[in-house]
Amino acid sequence: MANFIFSAFADEIDSNFEEQLKALKELNIGLIELRGVNGKSFIELSDEEVNAVKEQLDSYGIGISALGTPIGKITVDGDFEAHKKLLTRIMDIGDVLGCKVLRMFSFYPAEGMADDTFKSVVFDYIQQLLEMASARVFIL
């Protein structure tokens, strides 16, 4: 018989992080794909709040399967440099929380952009993100 590892977004259970962890524990789910914490995205947390999240996770014995990031959730004509800075912050948080796996999105095309141009830009953007992530041993 196969063994399965369950992980869940818990911010759809409750916006309160403590309640999320309680529910996961009750359901015997040992991993969370972290996204929302106390009504905001984990990427909006201060360093102190990130440390508190780590303490709560540890106290419940719950690990993180992946960080549910918004990386790639912009149009290709958006501010990619700001997006790269966001990736850096996300990796800083991942280091504190002990999670090296980042969920990401595909990029959205710019209005009127030709398919070949879109494909080329997306491949370039993903290559840049991969270089950043691999330098810090993160998986996109």
At which residue positions do the language-model features occur?
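Catalytic domains of carbohydrate-active enzymes, especially glycoside hydrolases
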Residues: 17-37, 93, 97-98
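Structural preference for beta-strand elements that scaffold enzyme active sites
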Residues: 3-7, 31-33, 61-68, 99-103, ...
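Short active-site-adjacent helix-start/loop capping segments
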Residues: 40-43, 73-77
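Boundary/entry segment of secreted carbohydrate-active catalytic domains
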Residues: 1-16
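Active-site acidic/histidine proton-transfer and metal-coordination neighborhood
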Residues: 16-19, 56-59, 76-140
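Glycine-rich, proline-tolerant flexible connector loops at the mouths of alpha/beta enzymes
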Residues: 33-58, 106-114
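A generic secondary-structure micro-motif detector
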Residues: 10, 42-43, 80, 119
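Active-site beta-loop-alpha junctions enriched in small/polar residues
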Residues: 9-13, 35-37, 67-72, 107-109, ...
